[in-house]
Amino acid sequence: MATRGFSCLLLVISEIDLSVKRWV
C-alpha cells in the first residue's frame, strides 16, 4: 500500500529537516 511509501517519505523529510537545521 501507500503507507510504506508515506513512511519512507516522512523519514526523508525528517532527515532533510535535520540537515537544514544543521546548516542554519
Swiss-Prot record:
This is Humanin-like 11. Disulfide bonds: none annotated. GO terms for molecular function: receptor antagonist activity. The gene is MTRNR2L11. GO terms for biological process: negative regulation of execution phase of apoptosis. Keywords: Cytoplasm, Secreted. Belongs to the humanin family. Plays a role as a neuroprotective and antiapoptotic factor. It is found in: Secreted; Cytoplasm. GO terms for cellular component: cytoplasm; extracellular region. Its main location: secreted.
